[in-house]
């Protein structure tokens, strides 16, 4: 085996894609010292998006102070490219799940306000083009936090201004954009989303993703009702129906919530990443693609990173093996086209133990070593 491409997404809440790829590379080097290894850390719009794009485009990294999902001060960074014209912003850096301890997660109370502050900072620096990766969030506020930070006001039936959090979507009665940052009129946004889910419903933002953000079943229902209500308010104010738009449910509804108010378009995050980084050119002469993410399940085939990698692998006739911290629906994943799908856990552990960064890296290294040892026996 002469060439292996490592194209891992982040193991959300545990280890980023760069560190995962380094652990896999170490295992391959020990077993196949003459093999060419190409580390290609990727992202689908969530964690690692800024890192992957900024690395490929040699971006300038800038920092700013914003607010986290619970409105606590935090320092974040983002990339600027194209001679200062474009900002590459990762939503997860301001309101991602890893910023909140698992026992404190509550999408009823979290906000995307900090993302809006990042955009405002970039506007001040002269940026007018934006790529915003919107996966991996701890929020379900449909982007009203971000819009509030940019000047939008959300009012209840008594004209009181609402706090921009998930539980208040159901209370939105009026939307006031009269104070929206004027620089937005000359700005363009590419919203890189990691899923194709609609805004609400059984496959929407609340039902599919809110539980992993800490929501109880009752809260899921309340959030979904809020999204339904807010979609209707948006339609009344802008004449845009975002209810069943593919990707509108990404990042707690942020995918759809931004389109009516910004010069924005939704694109598959993985397509943005792979095209920018010219992934297909790298894969053409490879013998194997190793990929993976924290959890492999039915969502893996819904426009997420591994689905995009698999499509390129199939096009170039290169086998794709996927590793996951947890694996569900193995047969369905095999039918999607993966050569093999493997869990990395060596024995039963608690979720908290499984998410420990060092434990995850050790498991990746051990699993990749076993995969390579098997391959060696059949390629002698």
Residue ranges and their predicted role:
Residues 2-134, 138-380:
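N-terminal loops that bind phosphate or other acidic moieties
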């Amino acid at each position: 085996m002469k060439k292996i491409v490592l194209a891992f997404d982040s193991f959300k809440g545990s280890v980023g894609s760069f560190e995962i790829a380094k652990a896999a590379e170490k295992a391959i080097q020990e077993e196949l010292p003459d093999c060419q290894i190409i580390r290609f850390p990727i992202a689908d719009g969530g964690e690692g998006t800024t890192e992957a794009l900024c690395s490929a485009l040699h971006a300038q990294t800038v920092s700013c102070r914003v607010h986290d999902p619970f409105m606590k001060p935090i320092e974040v960074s983002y990339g600027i490219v194209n001679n200062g014209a474009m900002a590459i912003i990762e939503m997860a850096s301001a309101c991602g799940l890893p910023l909140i301890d698992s026992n404190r997660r509550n999408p009823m109370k979290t906000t995307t306000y900090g993302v809006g502050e990042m955009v405002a900072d970039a506007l001040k620096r002269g940026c007018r083009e934006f790529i915003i990766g919107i996966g991996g969030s701890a929020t379900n506020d449909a982007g009203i936090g971000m819009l509030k930070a940019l000047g939008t006001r959300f009012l209840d039936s008594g004209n009181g201004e609402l706090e921009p959090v998930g539980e208040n979507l159901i209370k939105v009665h009026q939307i006031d954009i009269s104070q929206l940052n004027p620089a937005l009129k000359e700005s363009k946004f590419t919203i890189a989303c990691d899923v194709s889910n609609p805004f609400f419903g059984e496959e929407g933002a609340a039902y599919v993703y809110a539980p992993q953000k800490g929501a109880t079943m009752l809260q899921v229902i309340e959030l979904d009702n809020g999204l339904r209500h807010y979609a209707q308010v948006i339609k009344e104010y802008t004449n845009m129906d975002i209810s069943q738009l593919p990707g509108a449910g990404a990042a707690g509804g942020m995918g759809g919530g931004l389109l009516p108010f910004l010069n924005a378009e939704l694109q598959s995050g993985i397509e943005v990443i792979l095209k920018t980084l010219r992934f297909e050119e790298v894969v053409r002469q490879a013998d194997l693609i190793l990929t993976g993410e924290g959890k492999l399940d039915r969502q893996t085939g819904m426009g997420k990173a591994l689905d995009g990698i698999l499509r390129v692998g199939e096009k170039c006739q290169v086998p794709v093996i996927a590793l996951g911290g947890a694996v569900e629906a193995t047969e369905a994943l095999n039918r999607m086209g993966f050569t093999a799908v493997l869990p990395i856990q060596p024995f039963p552990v608690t979720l908290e133990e499984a998410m420990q960064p060092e434990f995850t890296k050790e498991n990746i290294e051990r699993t990749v070593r076993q995969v390579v040892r098997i391959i060696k026996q059949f390629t002698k």
